[in-house]
């Protein structure tokens, strides 16, 4: 996927990426994005994948979507190692702000678990909805400036409607913060604050909805 973006957006469309080579720019956006999307996808399907266990054994059901984050974190660790190798190949050293990158990672997991938990409960009641989830995640990717800057090619601001969508999207601030922390760029603290607020709300809503319908899982499954 990164090769496709690099070829068409980096070489053909020549999407501006600021001071970073496009390959590094897009990879530092896709690494945290795949952490998010993999966690959401796994959590969303976790209850249906564990239906036999849920119907026979009682345990806190919320543990099921939360446990789905484990493999995603392993993949993230491997991808981060590849990212470090790519930075070394480009002669780019991480900034001192690298130590702040885990803050963005933690908030990404907060958002992902909130969304994934909500979708997991929804999938139990509406099983066909699981086939819609990948398309929603794909649409969310293109609403997030992970593979492009949040400006047009001329540097002018994007239309107001687009900017509002990006501002309300918690992944916008989190990916921007992750990238800035990695390369020692100016840290977008305001965007991080908005992302933390929206992410915390999504996590709360996801858990509340899950707990409200949790008692019906064994009957439905």
Model region roles, listed by residue range:
Residues 1-22, 163, 176, 180-183:
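Transmembrane helix-loop-helix hairpins at lipid-water interfaces of multipass membrane proteins
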Residues 25-38:
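Long, hydrophobic alpha-helical segments
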Residues 75, 138-145:
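Faces of alpha-helical transmembrane segments in polytopic inner-membrane proteins
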Residues 142-193:
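Short hydrophobic, aromatic-rich alpha-helical segments embedded in or entering the lipid bilayer
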